[in-house]
Amino acid sequence: MNDSLSRLPREPADRLTKPFMRFLRIEATAGIILLLSTLLALGLANTAWSSSFLAFWEMPAGVRLGDIGIYRSLKHWINDGLMTFFFFVIALELKRELVLGELRNPRMAALPVAAALGGMAAPAGIYLLLVGGGPGASGWGTVMSTDTAFVIGCLALLGSRVPGSLRLFLLSLAIFDDIGAILIVAVGYGEPLNWVALGTGGLGFAFVAGIALLGIRSIPVYFAMGSAIWLAFDASGVHATLVGVILGLMTPARRWVSEIRLHAILDRVIAHPPGDHRSRDTAARSDLHRAGVATREAVSPIERLEIALHPWVAFAIMPLFAVSNAGIPIEDANFDVPLTIAIVVAFVVGKPAGIVLFSFLAVKLRLASRPEQLSWSLLAAGSLLTGIGFTMALFIAELAFEPELLIPVKLGVLGASVISAALGFMALTLLTSPNRR
């Protein structure tokens, strides 16, 4: 008996939701790992080993080939190098949702886009209003981002009570937020531009597009090209993590081999396996090799790369980023400084206010559609979680602020993340409790 007949048939919707649910499961677990990494960094930064711990991340590291050498601090390699993979995976997820997921509908995609714009504009405006022209005014980009892993981790604690429409809305919003933030970093917080290096990087992207059109599908080739483009952007003055965003959005979302062709190739292998007396062994092995290629290429490049990279990003790169950036000597800090207060208010108040306002305007102006399962009260409660800017906010803060301002800034980010997580969790718990349904 065919074993597949004993299983439920797969519906087309399963092809869309299965990768999405796998993404959520990984992100939920990653949120816990991120929290533990943050606590570890905070603990070590406030012990007798504080100086050694903080100095470790400033150690230079690099490679030299003849007269050419590339040396950066360990923190730089993490923040600019490894975090490129984070943004690459984020861009892959966005591309898949826009091409294959629910966001294929332009009006459905417009809602998280509008919400993300509000979630960036309102906190930046509040921050500038509170800081004025004082120290740290140029750091307005810090309050514009959302920590995807922590937001999904908070939703995971509520389990299945949270509707899928809210999960998708917040995930899409966080992705648009992060991409918007990295674009602002690339433009607003870069160094003076080296146009030769920038042009070289642009030619690299053109080359990648060209070999993709020629049908070259070798991931090592694209990795080598991506590395070369990253080096060019690192030398150009534009923040090199932008390379991850662009390459992620350039990655094909369609598979090369259809299911019909895959089944035909596999049927040929099954009918004439290697060693079968009715087929020549060389031809059968050629068919077997073709089946291996077809099996791999029946999965889209986006999904293959997500499967390969997401665990590394979620369980290695992001925790390493948190450990290297979240070390804040509490004894040297002062929560009462205006900068800290401005960051807390911008995240806790500005984020949800901007998201709700822009979402409401987009729906009322018929620019966007709101899913029926996503009530305004749920949207507002979920938006409270977007004040968790933690890892992304720390990432931008390292670029936007002078070193002497980083301690109060990091405390503001940490305080805002804790407050936003508590408020969002309590609001969603009340709204999704069985007594209210």
UniProtKB/Swiss-Prot annotation:
GO molecular function annotations of the record: sodium:proton antiporter activity
Family to which the UniProt record says this protein belongs: Belongs to the NhaA Na(+)/H(+) (TC 2.A.33) antiporter family.
Reaction(s) this enzyme catalyzes, per UniProt: Na(+)(in) + 2 H(+)(out) = Na(+)(out) + 2 H(+)(in)
Ranges annotated as spanning the membrane: 29-49, 74-94, 111-131, 139-159, 168-188, 196-216, 229-249, 307-327, 341-361, 376-396, 411-431
NCBIfam families from the UniProt entry: NhaA
GO cellular component terms attached to this protein's record: plasma membrane
Record keyword Transmembrane present: yes
Known function: Na(+)/H(+) antiporter that extrudes sodium in exchange for external protons.
Record has Protein biosynthesis as a keyword: no
Primary location recorded for the protein, binned into one broad class: membrane
Protein name, per record: Na(+)/H(+) antiporter NhaA
Subcellular location: Cell inner membrane
The organism of origin for this protein: Rhizobium meliloti (strain 1021)
Membrane topology (UniProt): Multi-pass membrane protein
Keyword entries, A-Z: Antiport, Cell inner membrane, Cell membrane, Ion transport, Membrane, Plasmid, Sodium, Sodium transport, Transmembrane, Transmembrane helix, Transport
